[in-house]
Amino acid sequence: MIYFLVVNYYSTNLVTKLIRSLPVDKKIEYKTIIVNNSPDDDSIYALKNEEILILNALDNLGFGGGCNLGINWIYTQEPQAIVWIINPDAYLKENILAQVELFFEAYPEISILGTIVHTPTGDVWFAGGRFIPATGAILTQDLLSNTDADYVACDWITGCSFIINLRKFDECPHFDPAYFLYYEDFDFCRRYANQGHLIAVTKQFGVLHQPSSITNRYVFRKIKNSSYGYLLSLDRYTNKVVFLLRLVRLIIYALILIIVKPQVAFGKFAGVFMYCRRLPKGHWRSQSLS
């Protein structure tokens, strides 16, 4: 069975649009799991029915934490399921569930699959992610437009449209709770790729997405969490020299932005502070000795 997993944070209108884009007929069996990361948002319960389950978080768990709540529930119900994590501000433009089932029957080797993501105007928003450890570059790259392949292996995929093939995992997979928002998708992919799992992206089916229609409401928090997640990822997947060069560049850029974009600048500083606060004592010293 396919389980759509949506993390809601005061986004009932967007989730409603997503739900309405899902197929009405049940030729392909599916359920929708909504994790409510805004417990006082009662409006989301208007969507609840036999096919839509709402899991209420006690507090805002962040994107990864909310996904973990849903994935754990799904795994206990059906450890062989396909879990399709999809942003509240994304939606399907056509009934493609039969294609999803056929895809995983044809390519059971894939553990984590991203789909092509378009904006409502038809522009490609995501078609693959690359990571260059030697420079610390975490890139989006169109790996799909110039190929007829059914899928292309890649380094990471966006959490906007993120499909997990649970049957490939001996234990329930999870996002690292150290990430609150941003780069948790990158970390998930790199962590499981390092364990031998295949990460890929396809254009056989996809979603439409209105970029940052949720997070742009909260500019300071968006920049703080993205800066923190960026530094945490570089710390884990690059070396000390690359990390320090990227850190210095981030701080210099924040200083430049203080006058013209103070919210962005202070968000970057807050992200650096957030990263430094979580480091264990002697972190870099132990890394240099290892």
Give the residues covered by each predicted segment:
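Short beta-strand-to-loop acidic/aromatic patch adjacent to the donor-nucleotide binding site
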Residues: 80-91
